[in-house]
Design a protein with these regions (language model features):
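Conserved phosphate- and dinucleotide-binding cores of soluble alpha/beta proteins
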Residues: 2-10, 61-217
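N-terminal active-site beta-alpha-beta segment that forms phosphate/nucleotide-binding
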Residues: 1-80
Length: 217
């Protein structure tokens, strides 16, 4: 059977469904920032950004951008009623102190035990950029990952062991790819959802770690 990969917006929308009411959440640079567009209005979700924002909202309408309102990815944002601004040092204290419920990050590699690599490929010409990723990986109560299932070269991003420098060890709780959703558990990597038309065997063939089929039916 044929299958269609999820778009970046579809991945973001899927993650938004799993963010509970009242959660304090950091959205990493790149794909995770799209999640703010899909949070339902009936949920109170407090979005945090490393540069010192709490309770920001989706991007403003074109022409209504405020150059002083940007997130850590230098993207324009809006502020919700009751939102707060604070020092960069205070922001990192929130991250490191266990005050964030969820961090949503990107990844170069995720190991089957939950190890994460997302700051450096180890290539001699690569520019390392850890930012606040290490602080979030160890400080947030839960870590969600959004990523393509394979690289542009077709190599698995979900692997048995990291070959890139680690960001955090045993820190990942759930992985959202363009093909599936995986829970990282003590028993192993459990596939709880996959795109329609994709068989479990096909998914396993594109994954460098052993998967457990936990899909319903």
């Amino acid at each position: 059977m044929s299958y269609t990969k999820l778009s970046r917006d579809q991945i973001a929308e899927r993650v938004a469904q799993d963010i509970p009411d009242g959660a304090y959440v950091n959205l990493g640079i790149g794909l995770p920032t799209k999640i703010s567009n899909y949070l339902p209005s009936d949920k109170d979700v407090f979005l945090h950004s490393e540069n010192g924002l709490l309770a920001f909202g989706p991007p403003p309408a074109k022409g209504e951008e405020d150059p002083e309102l940007i997130n850590a990815g230098k993207e324009f944002v809006t502020m919700l009623t009751g939102g707060a601004f604070f020092h960069h040092g205070d922001s990192f204290a929130m991250m490191r102190g266990g005050h964030l419920d969820i961090a949503v990050l990107g990844a170069f590699q995720i190991a089957e035990n939950g190890d994460l690599a997302n700051w450096h490929t180890g290539a001699p010409d690569a520019i390392p950029a850890v930012g606040g990723a290490m602080d979030l990986a160890v400080g947030a109560k839960k870590v969600f990952i959004t990523t393509d299932h394979v690289t542009k070269q077709g190599e698995p991003k979900i692997v048995a062991e990291l070959s890139y420098p680690a960001t955090g060890l045993k820190c990942v709780d759930r992985v959202y790819t363009d093909l599936c959703v995986i829970d990282v558990t003590a028993e192993g990597m459990k596939v709880i959802e996959k795109v329609e038309g994709l068989s479990f065997d096909e998914l396993q063939s594109m994954t460098g770690a052993k998967l457990i089929d936990a899909t319903k039916g």
